[in-house]
Amino acid sequence: MTGGHHFLAPAMEMHRLATTYEPTGMLQVGADFATLPEALQLHADAMKVTLEKADAYWPVDPAIVDLLGQIHALQLRAAEMARELTPAFEQLHDVDLTRLHNPRKSAQAEAMWDVSRNL
């Protein structure tokens, strides 16, 4: 058996990126969270192509096609669920986000309230 990189190589790259991710601040984290629905949708779209090819061209048992369909449905559900992340992030961190977007006097002055400066 040869190959195996079709699914594995991109997943390994995603894992590498996740383990080396060092956001500069929480606004970046929020912005990155906002891209998760699209990323998961693209992943589901790729699975749909695989599912369609398996169904139309590959000599696999129909049960395999069914399993791929179930996997695709779960991926679609994950993309849908990820759409809840940004509104939740904004709601649950409203006070922090308001302060970042509307600092008192200036960003430099607001930084004096930074927890790390007051421990």
Task: Give each language-model segment a name.
Residues T2-L119:
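Eukaryotic extended alpha-helical scaffolding/oligomerization regions
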